Amino acid sequence: MNITVISVGKIKEKYFTAAIDEYSKRLSRFAKLNIIELADEKIPDNASEKEIEQIKEKEGNKILAKLPQNSFVVTLCIEGKEHSSEELAKKIADISMTSSHITFIIGGSLGLSDTVKSKSALRLSFGKMTLPHQLMRVVLLEQIYRAFKINNNESYHK
């Protein structure tokens, strides 16, 4: 299984980098992981709705340029469907029956463009709260790792 995570925004804190490295190492037993980090666009103070949409489109174009072909695309967005860890594990297992590559997309601070969302086969939400993209990357990798542990009937703390 190949897993790609495309994320807008740079990881700045060392503790997030350490957590991402740890989960990347753990995941290597189950899947080939590729993390693509894209620069976010500058957001002017008091940006208009039009400027916000233009920024989301620019970031979206960068995402689409990096999107692997023939990959099952999952976008992380607040309006997506919430899953328990067990449900996400089942979803990943089901996807692996028809696709050898899953791409998870994390948008920038303004979210994802409608164009990117339209490319997704699954819109996934981790709840209604807004989380920083740096933390979201850690949470996503932990949940993917947990899903593989569940799917392989291996114990993992609850």
Question: Where on the chain are the PLM-derived regions?
Answer:
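Structured adenosyl-cofactor binding patch, chiefly the S-adenosyl-L-methionine
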Residues: 114-158
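A mid-sequence interfacial segment
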Residues: 86-127
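S-adenosyl-L-methionine/SAH cofactor-binding core of RNA-modifying enzymes
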Residues: 39-100
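A generic structural motif
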Residues: 28-34, 71
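General small-molecule cofactor/ligand-binding pocket signal
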Residues: 6, 34-36
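Conserved beta-strand scaffold positions in the cores of enzyme catalytic domains, especially
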Residues: 35, 73-75, 123
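Short glycine-rich anion-binding loops that position phosphate/pyrophosphate groups of nucleotides
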Residues: 11, 78-81, 108-111
